[in-house]
Amino acid sequence: MHDPENRLTDAYEPEVGNLPNEDSGRDEENVVKTGTTTVGLSTEDGVIIATDRRASLGGRFVSNKQVQKVEQIHPTAAMTLVGSVGGAQSFIRSLRAEADLYEVRRDEPLSIHALATLAGNFARGGPYFAINPIVGGVDEEGSHVYSVDPAGGVLEDDYTVTGSGTMVATGTIEGQYDHGMSLSEARDLAIRAVNAAAERDTGSGNGVVLAEITDEGVEIDAFDDYESAE
């Protein structure tokens, strides 16, 4: 039986993805239905992460048009925010703190694979709402992009897409992606993918946030429209 308090939370807590309210086994399905488009592309020179900027209330009302859905979590890594705003921000704070603690104790940065694995452990065991982020970064082994599902599964790929705009964005990337492409080309492709998703997906829109990740660090920029990002 559905709890009225949960219904109230569902309706009024801002989301950058989904806030689950029933069977936890349906978390990933719900994330895909209710909002946001996040894209991660790896190249030989680094990683590009792109997201839209829209947050919604209950998936029906646009509550914010300037959300930064990408955060730096490591000297050479970033992660997207997907889920309720509070849950996603708490998740990133916890992950960033663990990565910093590791670096202090070991006097070396966490590898991107270990960082993604830690994110998966947090997603599975923590009190976070439908976390389905992308982790992208660069380490001694090269460029990496991982998707983390709500059950804690961690998968590495050359590129990945999460959120309700997944099908449209993936279709845009599929025929044009090449691991040997330049960072500039990957940036343009990521922008086109998010823009295409925003044209058809009501949960995505209002510009784009871009993160460019190399072995020198992370640079994050936000744009109100797709033309100015190109």
Swiss-Prot record:
Its main location: cytoplasm. It is found in: Cytoplasm. InterPro entries: Ntn_hydrolases_N, Pept_T1A_Psome_bsu_arc, Pept_T1A_subB, Proteasome_sua/b, Proteasome_suB-type. Signal peptide: none annotated. The formation of the proteasomal ATPase PAN-20S proteasome complex, via the docking of the C-termini of PAN into the intersubunit pockets in the alpha-rings, triggers opening of the gate for substrate entry. Interconversion between the open-gate and close-gate conformations leads to a dynamic regulation of the 20S proteasome proteolysis activity. The keyword Repressor does not apply. The active site is at residue 36. Residues 1-35 form a propeptide. GO terms for molecular function: threonine-type endopeptidase activity. Gene3D superfamilies: Glutamine Phosphoribosylpyrophosphate, subunit 1, domain 1. The keyword Kinase does not apply. Its EC number is 3.4.25.1. Component of the proteasome core, a large protease complex with broad specificity involved in protein degradation. The 20S proteasome core is composed of 14 alpha and 14 beta subunits that assemble into four stacked heptameric rings, resulting in a barrel-shaped structure. The two inner rings, each composed of seven catalytic beta subunits, are sandwiched by two outer rings, each composed of seven alpha subunits. The catalytic chamber with the active sites is on the inside of the barrel. Has a gated structure, the ends of the cylinder being occluded by the N-termini of the alpha-subunits. Is capped at one or both ends by the proteasome regulatory ATPase, PAN. Belongs to the peptidase T1B family. This is Proteasome subunit beta 2.
